């Protein structure tokens, strides 16, 4: 009886860990997908776009009129809806 309870609890714990790991991977997938879509090589950039879609961080800022998105880490248009 003790062994079966131990195996049941161990199995439930393992199931929890596997589900948590797969869920965290699913949360990262959209960020990686969008980053790869908007990652542009410097040869293909159009001058009209300026900095839109460029990778950035807080040390390496964006062009004027653009801000670094906290979530996606690329330059986006600045606007009143941005925090």
UniProtKB/Swiss-Prot annotation:
UniProt xrefs under InterPro entries: Huwentoxin-1 (IPR011696), Huwentoxin_CS1 (IPR013140)
An example molecular function term from Gene Ontology annotations: toxin activity
Disulphide linkage map: 51-63, 56-68, 62-75
Tissue-level expression: Expressed by the venom gland.
Coiled-coil blocks: none
Propeptide position ranges: 22-49
Chief location of this protein within or outside the cell: secreted
KW Transmembrane helix (keyword) present: no
N-terminal signal peptide: 1-21
Keywords, sorted A to Z: Cleavage on pair of basic residues, Disulfide bond, Knottin, Lectin, Secreted, Signal, Toxin
Annotated compartments: Secreted
GO cellular component entries: extracellular region
Note: Exists in two forms, due to cis-trans isomerization at Gly-79-Pro-80. The trans isomer is the most abundant (75%).
Free-text function comment from the UniProt entry: Agglutinates human and mice erythrocytes. This activity can be specifically inhibited by mannosamine. This lectin shows very low toxicity in both mammals and insects.
Family to which the UniProt record says this protein belongs: Belongs to the neurotoxin 10 (Hwtx-1) family. 51 (Hntx-8) subfamily. Hntx-8 sub-subfamily.
Record's comment describing the protein's domains: The presence of a 'disulfide through disulfide knot' structurally defines this protein as a knottin.
Record-given protein name: U5-theraphotoxin-Hs1a 1
